[in-house]
Amino acid sequence: MYPAHLLVLLAVCVSLLGASDIPPQPLNLVQFSSMIQCANHGRRPTSNYMDYGCYCGKGGSGTPVDELDRCCKIHDDCYGEAEKSQKCAPYWTWYTWKCGSDGPQCDDSKTGCQRFVCDCDATAAKCFAKAPYNKENYNIKTRCQ
């Protein structure tokens, strides 16, 4: 093998090692997004909830600013309980559900982590659908300290 080939091979190996440290996107968020659309019948895009209030989106702090933000805090707390009491990884837990006439419904045959996380998401999606959406509470993280 020529020295240039060895350098190329080494570069490929190093880049593959670096890529292995990049975590994949949580699968559960795809299901949660679909549940939200099921519950609100497509009236609001899921992206509207990604940076709303103090708790909708990644992390959360402060006091929820309204009913919708409280739904997000309850969902965050539910995921925390899933991690603590159920020893689940809620962002990675895949579950079975269907979209019924009254919103998302979890598969009754599932137990443990799958059912717990599904219930967290279904409850939140229904809560989102009932809560008013106030545009002035979108992208306000500076008020949530």
Curated annotation (Swiss-Prot):
Tissue: Expressed by the venom gland.
Family: Belongs to the phospholipase A2 family. Group I subfamily. D49 sub-subfamily.
A biological process term (GO) from this entry: phospholipid metabolic process
Keywords: Calcium, Disulfide bond, Hemostasis impairing toxin, Hydrolase, Lipid degradation, Lipid metabolism, Metal-binding, Platelet aggregation inhibiting toxin, Secreted, Signal, Toxin
Keyword Disulfide bond on entry: yes
Gene Ontology molecular function, alphabetical: calcium ion binding; calcium-dependent phospholipase A2 activity; phospholipid binding; toxin activity
Gene3D superfamilies cross-referenced by the UniProt entry: Phospholipase A2 domain (1.20.90.10)
Positions annotated to bind Ca(2+): Y55, G57, G59, D76
Active-site positions on this chain: H75, D121
Reaction catalyzed: a 1,2-diacyl-sn-glycero-3-phosphocholine + H2O = a 1-acyl-sn-glycero-3-phosphocholine + a fatty acid + H(+)
Disulfide bonds: C38-C99, C54-C144, C56-C72, C71-C127, C78-C120, C88-C113, C106-C118
Organism: Austrelaps superbus (Lowland copperhead snake)
Cell compartment(s), UniProt: Secreted
Cofactor details (free text): Binds 1 Ca(2+) ion.
Enzyme Commission code: 3.1.1.4
The protein's required cofactors: Ca(2+)
Top EC group: hydrolase
InterPro entries hit by this protein: PLipase_A2, PLipase_A2_Asp_AS, PLipase_A2_dom, PLipase_A2_dom_sf, PLipase_A2_His_AS
Name of the protein this chain belongs to: Basic phospholipase A2 S6-45
Function: Snake venom phospholipase A2 (PLA2) that inhibits collagen-induced platelet aggregation. PLA2 catalyzes the calcium-dependent hydrolysis of the 2-acyl groups in 3-sn-phosphoglycerides.
Gene Ontology CC annotations of this record: extracellular region
Entry keyword Oxidoreductase: no
Prosegment location in residue numbers: 20-27
Extent of the signal sequence: 1-19
